[in-house]
């Protein structure tokens, strides 16, 4: 606590006292010694602000700048008032060193010549500030504020779209929205604060004119001085005061201009200048040649121009050497890669008897390599890391590391996902373009190349960046190429989670659980071999049921499994699903805990329950003829499709006897319908029946007669 109080009194209290001093300096008379100190502080303080602006990486990193601009402006005006009071009060007895120094040493002359020089310098400073720096900075601040505020809604919608697509996490979405708010606050404040700078320039002219006129009145009328002497004294001091006031103001104007003209480039101003001025050696050679041509012309300063030409040529030579080194390094890298490939090809005889396959891999055409190029941001790599974390949280499955391979046999703009070396999905991208997906109500078509979203098969359009905002406004969901692959990867992991979960993964789950729940693990491993545990977990994942609640799953297996290994896997899966019933219900229920369900007609349900059989790999199936399958599936579609169009995503609710077999029937026909049993529905869930699946009685009777 002591440390916190100390920090408070050395920062917040100091700032508060400083602001009060600034305000009171306007009305409280100051001794000349204090005035000198404050003027020197004002000069160095504005210089520090300028240096801070030059070294920040982006404008919002210096978010206190608008407040500092106001404080510095008021402080400078307070010093103007105090110095005017002292000059008019003391006249030629004024002993302020800072103003005297600027009125004599900085001006570079004395007498009438010094006045003319000082007045000229003062006018030039005023003109530069008023018509060049301040006017430009004010205009840029206005435009930046307007565009920032106009695009806030669009940026927020884009962030929401990426979050809903699973591309970014909730924390990343919040941070991006906070950054948008910071930018809006900063540029909105700068729009108003820039008016302080322009107003400061105008008031400087006014104060100078008033000081000269008031000085002549005081000197000639009240002090009985001669007109020439009064003009010399007060004009000299006024110009010194004006120059001393305008120099900090000029520094502040330059800082304002710099901070509102900074682009989105990363790095400080100096780093950006160095990087962008060192891209081409040819520029410096051309500049050197131009200087040599000027040097040989009559009347030009030959030695200075030749010296500058040599300097430019030297810089060009250094850049050319660096370019050659980069080219050599690049060639060496390519040679090393080729040599490595040759060594790989030549060393096949030394390879072991087994070449393991990657559990999950992403192969890219060479045109998509920039997406994983670390020198260009490698945005896709960071997204993949987030996806693996989300898979662990959503499904309870720790996805394996994803190997990324450049496949020269792929189309340059294509990519594909493989699990254990077998392709499971592929897509095609256009780098530099955005995919506008018709995910909802679209009010207007946008120009572009018509295509299909590779993840969900929705109609989409490839659009240019200039049409991105328009597409978002009319209802499209717009995603970047890296986000497309990331979303596709998320879907691949979800739909193929059962194939990704190997026995080694299951053993890792068991080992991790043993550390905190050794009794549960010992009980289940005594009754269930590793292979059966794997099949149960795969059965859950195959139907998108999270296995994160591993303790509940293992306890259920321990309760219902048998050491004689006689309990079939489908039975164990049903028992585990019943234990996880509330979790499954929440997965499909709406916000009011209402589960929208389809039911089977009782006669159809009875008929199907008599058709259950187990395959050799322990899958529960329905032994129906092709005609019977067709009629059952058509009856389900008749209820499911209209209900889906009304906005519901219903599940099929049936008995636990045929639940698994019905899901396998849908899966074999690529119908994505969740199937639950009555025993899985928790007591606090409300069930709303949206339709009954039935077949005409004559058809059911025909089925029975065939038996």
Swiss-Prot record:
Keywords: Bacterial flagellum biogenesis, Bacterial flagellum protein export, Cell membrane, Membrane, Protein transport, Transmembrane, Transmembrane helix, Transport. GO terms for cellular component: plasma membrane. InterPro entries: FHIPEP_1, FHIPEP_3, FHIPEP_4, FlhA, T3SS_FHIPEP. Residues 329-340 have a biased composition (Basic and acidic residues). It holds the Pfam family FHIPEP. It is a multi-pass membrane protein. Belongs to the FHIPEP (flagella/HR/invasion proteins export pore) family. Involved in the export of flagellum proteins. This is Flagellar biosynthesis protein FlhA.
